[in-house]
């Protein structure tokens, strides 16, 4: 979690994106396998990279919380967005989807042209 916060701060500040970071404090009390930690970090990193490369956003909200028996990661921006119906996923999004599948998680991408993008990962906890 600390690495994710540091990466977010560095990435957002370097690219002059205003951001809000909402991470639950209870992450110290949950157990996630090392492999799933790695997947989670790399999904987060790829989502930030995509935001910087394609979104042209000014603001972002990055949150990670525990709800019931699920870890929910959400990355939301106010960028240019895209039409998800006519979008052909590149390697980055395909890799994120593959990692989510390996975690037995669900990755949702919601985007509207001119209104930004929200990426949400729902990961079941043991």
Task: Kindly give the residue locations of the regions a language model identified.
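Coiled-coil dimerization/phosphotransfer module
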Residues: 1-126
